[in-house]
Amino acid sequence: MISDELFQTLLQQMKAVRALFPDLCLEQAEDGRFVVRGSLGFQTQRDGKVVEAEYEIEINIPDTYPQSPPVVRETGGKIPEDFHTNGDTTRCLGVPLEVRMRFSEHATLIHYLTGQVVPFLFSHAYFSLYGDMPFGERPHGAAGLLDFYKELLGVEQDLVVLGFLRILADDDYKGHVPCPCGRGLILRKCHGQQLREARDHQRASDFLNEWIAVFKYLVEQAPNADYRGVVPKRIMKAHRRRAI
């Protein structure tokens, strides 16, 4: 059931949206959920190259908004399906945790649009005109997850990332244990803050799914590596049950 509080929040936030993007409108879908639909136009430049474009978009607002970010679809057919598209046809604005953390900094529709949606659309428009991505491009799938977590945690080793994801997947943060990065410090004095922040933005089950994706990817690359010590307890328990 859609709360009146959510409706009032969206009405208030749409004032800033319509001031900048007057062709975007708040609507209520047949299932009762709120969506923002319409044309979004912009003109900007990078490295002296001017880009002016307009896209038809649909932003779906979750019932848990603003604790959870919206998702966006491009509905005008300008962007091909193979350009950063998720399996549910929403557009991939980044790694899920990355999107959630960015949104939480300013949990409003206008900041979501200007901080995440417009940069995505600008990247497509720029790529269409000039043939390269203006902000670089993260790999897709598990390789992109691995790349993001290395950047977030400031580490380079693949197995270290799996070690951190194991802690998050098991919801097993203990500040007094050695940090998986190998620097010799306990977790709370090393990467504790990053893990606590990540844990605040994503469920353990989502981290488990990411661990599985990264693990499968790494096994293909290095099947003989020693993965002991970085396997979530939930995976170990399931493996033991199957072995009995």
Summary of predicted features, one role per range:
Residues 5, 10-115, 126:
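Compact alpha/beta protein-protein interaction domains typified by the UBC
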